[in-house]
Amino acid sequence: MDQIYDVIIIGGGAAATSAAMTLKNRGKTFAVVANKAETGSLYKAEKITNYPGLPPMSGAEMTELFRQQLIDTGATIIEGRALSVLPMEGTFGVAVGSDYYMAGSIILTAGITREKLYPGEAEYLGRGVSYCATCDGMLYRGKTVAVVGGGEEAKQDADFLESIGCSVLRFEKNGRYEISGGMKANLLKFAGEEYPVDCVFIIKDTVSVTQLVPGLSYENGGILVDRRMATAVPGVFAAGDCTGKPLQLAKAVGEGNVAALSACDYLDKK
């Protein structure tokens, strides 16, 4: 994409909505990378009773309110999974599926990833482990690959890989998968069986922030930030559940506002 946004927000929940509203008020250009609303933890909450100014309502109802407010900011909404964020000479490149977007600053509001990494997943990422079939599939044309994950996206990725000539092993069941190899991953273990493969494509709703952005620091299970919501990577800010406990809605909204103001200050001083 030719356009370089001032800010890209990764995540579409309460912190993201708060950040987007602030960026709009400050006259910045911004895009929001978000999965479908129903994949968020707020959506699944039975009832929210502790948010000031609003009556008790279900998580799904509150998610819809936030999503409409997000749309009303005029943000460019990019539906999909952010796969990586890479610093690039004063800007950042964000990979979403097979597309690429650029921004001067990043705000992480991706919540928390409750799924644990499989053994070998982090070690072999980029060396026989991939989160994106359309990005990396052609590298394994004519070879044997595994697709781990259920749902429509996993099915579409497996179908695509077969269409380009890959021999595809499909794994839809939950359980313990283990990836091993030498310089590159070449073996997938599951349910007591071993499967020689050239690549393992792992399809999840979100990519953990520990895999998303290189160079971040962590403390007590969350991204380490200062009072400005600045991370250890200049130009990258974080807000909401991804910064750690308490995992509260009001905290996420406040941090989203602060992160956006700090991103604006960062951009204005460049």
Description of each model-found segment:
Residues I4-D6, E79-G80, R141-T144, V233:
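Phosphate-coordination loops involved in phosphoryl transfer and adenosine-cofactor binding
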Residues Y5-E61, L65, Q69, K143-V147, ...:
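Beta1-alpha1 glycine-rich phosphate/pyrophosphate-binding loop at the start
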Residues N25, E123-L139, I203-K251, E255-L261, ...:
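FAD-site-proximal beta/loop scaffold in flavoenzymes
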Residues E64, L70-E89, V94-A95, Y101-A103, ...:
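A Rossmann-like FAD-binding core segment of flavoenzymes
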Residues G111-R114, D205-V207:
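Short glycine-rich anion-binding loops that position phosphate/pyrophosphate groups of nucleotides
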Residues I112-G150:
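Glycine-rich dinucleotide-binding loop and its adjacent helix/turn
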